[in-house]
Curated annotation (Swiss-Prot):
Keyword annotations: Cell inner membrane, Cell membrane, Electron transport, Membrane, Translocase, Transmembrane, Transmembrane helix, Transport
Name of this protein: Ion-translocating oxidoreductase complex subunit E
UniProt record similarity statement: Belongs to the NqrDE/RnfAE family.
Organism: Azotobacter vinelandii (strain DJ / ATCC BAA-1303)
Primary residence: membrane
A cellular-component GO term for this protein: plasma membrane
Role: Part of a membrane-bound complex that couples electron transfer with translocation of ions across the membrane.
InterPro entries: NqrDE/RnfAE, RnfE
Subunit field text: The complex is composed of six subunits: RnfA, RnfB, RnfC, RnfD, RnfE and RnfG.
Catalytic activity, EC: 7.-.-.-
Length: 238
């Protein structure tokens, strides 16, 4: 168990490289399985654009910290590993914060303090402790990319649902927040829609997250039943 409250996820001894990514993306999803990083998940996702920006920033931090901590795993003594990991995470987050302030200033103003708070994100520290200290650099990078992609997907879906219900748009202000190249993402889903106020308020985030959690449970159960049925058919054929 991580000191940050993140569950120490057991990993198989051997995996095909892409399995490190896919298992982190779905099986150990940061928000839907480990229930970590709920503060930005609920607070930032008023629009899909905000969710995408926060997700990409977190993904960058996860990939870089996983790579750095994994490369130092044989040189960090157990007595000081937590301060060292927090220092590495803080350094990477500071660089990410400065980069977003320089090149995505409008998005930086919207996300504000939540970028700096990635330092305290239990998903980052917990994964560094439970995975990166035990695995080589390449699997750690793939794991970080999978964790970040899964987290980004959840933020975008929650933000997209709330934005559509709240204002009838999708990825609004993407060109101003992310850059002019993202103008094509801006969609008016429901023209002249007055919106549902609850959707853009904090309770709306909890409600949408609850539906996503339920949907994942249903999908996982159906997949398990399908695998069990297939296994039973193979046994009969043998």
């Amino acid at each position: 168990m991580s000191h940050c409250g993140a569950p120490s996820v057991p990993e198989p001894e051997k995996k095909v490289p892409w399995q490190y990514f896919t298992s982190a993306l779905w099986q150990y999803n940061v928000a839907l399985v480990q229930m970590l990083a709920l503060c930005p998940t609920l607070a930032v996702t008023t629009t899909a654009t905000n969710g995408l920006g926060m997700g990409l920033a977190t993904t960058l931090v996860l990939v870089m910290t996983n790579a750095l901590i994994s490369s130092m795993r044989h040189t960090i003594s157990p007595e000081v590993r937590n301060p060292v990991m927090i220092g590495v995470i803080a350094g990477v987050v500071t660089l990410t914060d400065m980069a977003m302030n320089a090149w995505m200033h409008e998005l930086y103003k919207v996300l504000g303090l939540f970028i700096a708070l990635i330092v305290t994100n239990c998903a980052v520290l917990g994964r560094a402790e439970s995975f990166c200290l035990r695995n080589p650099v390449i699997p750690s990078i793939l794991d970080g990319a999978g964790m970040g992609a899964g987290f980004t997907a959840v933020l975008v879906v929650i933000g997209g649902i709330r934005e559509i219900l709240g204002s009838g748009t999708l990825f609004s202000q993407a060109s101003s927040l992310l850059g002019s190249h993202f103008k094509w993402m801006e969609i008016t889903v429901i023209p002249d829609f007055q919106g549902i106020l609850l959707a853009i308020l904090p309770p709306g985030a909890f409600i949408v997250l609850g539906f996503l959690l339920a949907a994942k449970r249903v999908i996982d159960r159906k997949r398990a039943e399908r695998r069990q049925q297939t296994h039973g058919e193979l046994v009969v054929l043998q």
